[in-house]
Amino acid sequence: MTTLSHAAVGLLVTKFFVDRGWLPDATITPYILGVAFANIPDIDGLVSLRRVYDHHSALKNLSHYPANWFIVFGFVALLAIPFHIRYFYTYLGLATVNVFLHFILDTFSIYHGIAWFGPWNKKKYSFIRMLPIIPSDTHEWVHWYMKHWVLYLEIALWIVTLMVLLEHWI
């Protein structure tokens, strides 16, 4: 899935948290953080801007191993205990849910998928693998992606997100 789809899911999850009163609704901050949390596993894309179609290999998949994020979030939670930061654990929950959903979306990748049991087992899982190989460049990735039905799934996700948020803000 693409950054826009991860962002859409981040917005929907944040709206869920806000609607339940778990996060403040008088500010845009939760939504900005929700989008950031939903895209944080793709931090490796910043390291490999020239090869964004194959960004998972930039950090040797470290940011795309679910176990690594549970370790990071657990460590951050322990460090935060003495500070009693308001909404901290709610935002940590938002981050955890968004990162997990990021991996679910990436399991719908048109090639390789996610190494759910990494770093111990590097076998990648994809529900709908279409490409047997990694594209040679971003242009080739876009070419294949435009032909795949996942594109329409993403467009539907964007439309639903816009409808839900517009209903919320209008």
Task: Describe these PLM feature segments.
Residues 1-170:
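N-terminal membrane-targeting hydrophobic helices
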